[in-house]
Amino acid sequence: MPWLQIRINTTPDHVPAFEDTLLDCGAMVVTFEDVHDDPVYEPDLNTTPLWKNTKVTGLFEADADIEHIRPVIEHKAESLGETDIDMKIEIVEDKDWEREWMDNYHPIQFGERLWVCPSWREVPDPNAVTLMLDPGLAFGTGTHPTTALCLQWLDSIDCKDKTIIDYGCGSGILGIAGLLLGANNMVGIDIDPQAVQATEANAERNKIDPSRLEVKLPPYESDLQADIVVANILAGPLAHLAPTISALVKNQGQLALSGILANQAQEVIEAYQEWFTIDSITEKEEWVRIVGTKHA
């Protein structure tokens, strides 16, 4: 059967109010999406991660009284200071929503050897290195340029018998990719307990021996170091945490930083030059990856 769909574009702080309003008006379900397909980075503790511009969608039965619902939403928008609400109302045909969502995700190749593949898809190349990973709300799945840049770099280097730290690990995608590419063991570091569960679950899904993987919440031991460190977070935290992240890299070890817009790259480079020789800066869709080798 058809449905009445109401979509509201708003800011994260107004999302709960619009969600409650839609549910109070009789919405069968309310969902959140990103307006501009931006990434959601790992959330702080006890927070719900949302995009800077969020689309709130409510689905109602087709015969819902829109003449009653519309003014209720407009009144709520006015009370929130949104005098010109961005709202779209339409009738949509019934469909298998779960199937449509799943159909949007396909195996993706990163570099020469590495693929990331949803669990419901057939592995495209049985001889390739395949990381099985399903999409989730807060953590990376390889679709964003910053994650792609890091995965491509891991595919291009020699991970064999190395140790790797995935700083801000989220889903653990980067560290697990390193293990599949030959690293001996990996340590994931994150401030969110959800990351521990997500990384361990994804490692199990990829048949990683638990002895090769550990996920830590701060504080961690002061002498922790690895041959390879990957940090895909944001430019501000990367610059602020430069001494902390640099200390995790062994002498002559490799560091890859991403989550950085092109116009932020110089700030991050300057924060790390004390400890690293910058080997390369790679740009993809206005995002960059900075790679360096630690001084002996």
UniProtKB/Swiss-Prot annotation:
Keyword Secreted carried by entry: no
Cited InterPro entries: Ribosomal_L11_MeTrfase_PrmA, Ribosomal_PrmA_MeTrfase, SAM-dependent_MTases_sf
Protein residues bound to S-adenosyl-L-methionine: T147, G168, D190, N232
One GO location term (cellular component): cytosol
Calcium listed as a keyword: no
GO MF term set: protein-lysine N-methyltransferase activity
Protein name per UniProt: Ribosomal protein L11 methyltransferase
Gene transcribed to yield this protein: prmA
